[in-house]
Regions:
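P-loop NTPase Walker A phosphate-binding motif
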Residues: 28-58, 154-156
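A short hydrophobic beta-strand->loop->alpha-helix junction that borders the nucleotide-binding pocket
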Residues: 55-65, 90-93
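Alpha-helical sensor/transducer elements of the RecA-like P-loop NTPase core
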Residues: 10-13, 40-42, 72, 130-218, ...
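Conserved adenine-nucleotide phosphate-binding loops and their immediately adjacent elements
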Residues: 1-19, 84-88, 184
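Winged-helix-like regulatory helical subdomains adjacent to P-loop NTPase cores
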Residues: 4, 11, 201, 221-255
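Conserved NTP-binding/hydrolysis module of P-loop NTPases
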Residues: 67-87, 103-105
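Conserved Walker B catalytic segment
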Residues: 99-151
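Phosphate-binding P-loop
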Residues: 18-27
């Protein structure tokens, strides 16, 4: 799990996720823009179920395919006493999504579990997408204590929200900015922060944790606009195509 320097707020979001997970077998999709705190929330969610469920945290990488993920799952299942999935991988050069999902859910029968997948937007492997789609449907109506939680920058419905009969297969819980009280605690570098100034900053940042941290870093020199511009340039603008940059330039002129 990633190390957290600090953590403020998010109690409402965490309570909501925990209640849904405890209520029944479920799949949750938690989308949010870059820097909004998805990995932090994922870490805290796992902490809530520590010593209560078998836990798997997997952070996706750009280069990753389904095979490497399946091998991680096989090792995890073997550690909790079930080698069925590992045997399947050893005998199957090209695992099938439906089979992999069924074996995974079957292996967790009678085993309270929480599977947290972080940075799912990085996954381009169709087999892995189809496996999670099949797993979300397999969990539908299950009486087992199994939960699958996907954290992603993408707001696209990567898992089905309903099955063919209209039953809810997954829930989408978008992650927004911090509330006013939690966000203000991130501005530790400000010696004095008037309410009016804080309201302006919170309105500007919309409670975005990373934006608030960048503002905090520039507080002593009064240069937080520069840190924000650097972040936008490196993390967003530099990754756009030429056509996307032209569209943004046009919008900036004619807004």
């Amino acid at each position: 799990l990633p190390r957290l320097r600090h953590f403020y707020g998010r109690e409402k979001e965490l309570d909501n996720m925990a209640n849904l997970i405890e209520a029944r077998a479920t799949t949750l999709l938690v989308p949010g823009i870059a820097g909004i705190g998805k990995t932090t929330v994922a870490s805290k969610l796992i902490e809530r179920f520590m010593h209560r469920r078998n836990l798997l945290y997997h952070r996706c990488q750009d280069w990753e395919g389904s095979r490497s993920f399946f091998e991680s799952v096989a090792d995890w299942l073997a550690n909790i006493g079930d080698s069925t999935f590992a045997d399947y991988l050893a005998a199957t050069p090209v695992p099938q999504p439906a089979d992999a999902a069924r074996l995974l859910v079957d292996a967790l029968e009678g085993t309270p579990s929480l599977i947290v997948i972080d940075d799912f937007h990085k996954v381009a492997d169709a087999t892995l997408h189809q496996t999670f789609q099949a797993m979300s449907l397999a969990l539908l109506g299950s009486e087992e204590e199994i939960a699958l939680v996907l954290f992603s920058r993408s707001f696209k419905p990567v898992v089905p929200t309903k099955d063919a009969e209209g039953r809810i297969a997954s829930l989408v819980l978008p992650l927004d900015g911090l509330d006013s009280d939690a966000g203000r605690k991130l501005l530790s570098s400000f010696d004095e922060l008037a309410d009016e100034q804080w309201l302006h900053i919170h309105g500007l940042s919309r409670g975005h944790p990373l934006v608030l941290e960048l503002i905090n870093r520039g507080a002593s020199a009064g240069a937080f606009h520069e840190t924000l511009e650097n972040y936008v340039t490196v993390e967003i603008f530099s990754k756009l195509s030429a056509e996307q940059k032209r569209v943004l330039s046009a919008l900036a002129i004619y807004r």
